Amino acid sequence: TFVLGRKINPKVSSIGAIDGLQAEKSFGNFYTGIIAGFRPDISDYNFNPDLMQYGAYVGLKSQTKGFYSHTTLGAMEQNNSGNVDRRYTYFQHSSTIAQKLNIFSSFELDLYNQVTADSVGKPRLTNLYILVGYRINRMVDFSLSYNSRKQIVYYETLKTDIERMLDDDIARQGIRATVNIRPANYIGIGGSYSKRFQSNDLNKSDNLNGYLSFSKIPWIDGRFYANYNRNISNYMQTNIYSVRYSRPIIKMKLDGDIYYRL
């Protein structure tokens, strides 16, 4: 399989968009691929010929009755005007069990440290994400996720900020739990709780969110959505209420929308 142009590869989605060539070959349940091209500009997401990147990956896929999974391991080097900007390895896994349990996980290990002149320095975990979702039945599903992120250091692109970024090399962590309930056709109820934290107690926050939706209102038609959000951080506390009603005025041509936020 060959792809030319800008595309996000679902097997290595943590890399983001790739401008260039992607090629992949399968050998039974195993697959291998190469990437050669450029990454979008960090400031405006446009094509930038100075930001060359290349890498390769291997993976294993499995599909049986009641089980489906993809697991990928790869390495990538990103340059800026011919100089090493970032060098790292990445891992990604996704699986579905019995059409009810979904698991997704990924991590990135940075290997290059220009400051210490190590072409392969001490591995630095810059990104870890784990998501588990479970569908109890057609009416109820919930999910739980954890993420830990450090600032990604591009040694050439962000050279004026390297010392500050490495001095602030603290993982921002977060957990999130969500639940969605569909008690009847056209009715949805749900909520989520998320918490952000880091080891020095800065940038902490707690967020609670809940919603009620009617996708088809009897007699008057249209859609109704009500939402409540409460956020508490080191600096402020907010409570936001919002409601929205929308419906078609001229079918397939004109919609009307009323929104109120408090």
Predicted regions and their residues:
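Gram-negative and organellar
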Residues: T1-L262
